[in-house]
Amino acid sequence: MNEINRQNYPSILQSFGIVGMVFISMACFIPLNYFLNHQVGKEISMLVYYILSTGVPAFIIYFIRKKKVGEVHIILNIGNRRVLVLALVGTIALLLGIISPIVTSIPMPESFKKVFLELGKMNGFLSILLAVLAAPILEEFIFRGIVLDGLLKRYSPMKSILVSSLLFGLVHLNPWQFITGFTMGVFIGYVYLNTRSLLLAMLMHSTNNLIGTVQMQFTDMESILNKTLIEIYGGLINLIIAIVGSVLVFAVCMYYLKIEFKKLEPLVQNSPIDIPLTDQN
């Protein structure tokens, strides 16, 4: 059993190597992004850059995993619609009432404000396509389909989810998106652990990004970035109601998700992922 686990890919160290591979790929494609930016515009260049800089390492990682393990199981089926609804509602509650207040309360330097404002200006169809389709597919394939899936075969579920979420947060390269990536990664990882559905993970990620995209489309980002947390929510009472309400909604979703997951246990136990009871080195 120990020998089998050592052959599974990736280990924690190899998972950090995967993130390093993504960073190297991002750096290598910067010249292409710069060139396309001047030839076809920011939105097309950003979409092409993202697909190549994330897609190339995704394929490399996939073939490494396939070579080491022999077979890569990817479940693109949701199965239980109740789990889908609870997971998506939980995603919205977690983002709007828990993550957003934390992220908004962290001061942002002017240099980062300019970056976020520039991103907010890219509000065409291709930018939406990148945020709600390309990013969820490629990032979930890497961080849940390969990294978390492999870690679950070598380590305990808690360690596997925390490590994969940490790496998912780090790849976003700034503290504000790190908090969102890590926290949302833990929730998505928990749902993936109990369903093995990569499609469900992608839909949760897409929902998270869609909310952010809608906020950029229909709000004055410059005004929001210069307001305090209480001002953004329109007063302390509104902030408290938003947080308490979201926490309650999220708690209800978690309660019913646990009930649904118990029903799925026989199917999950017969899935291709063999989860060790203790960590394997």
Predicted regions and their residues:
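Membrane-interface helix/loop boundary segments of multi-pass membrane proteins
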Residues: 138-163, 190-197
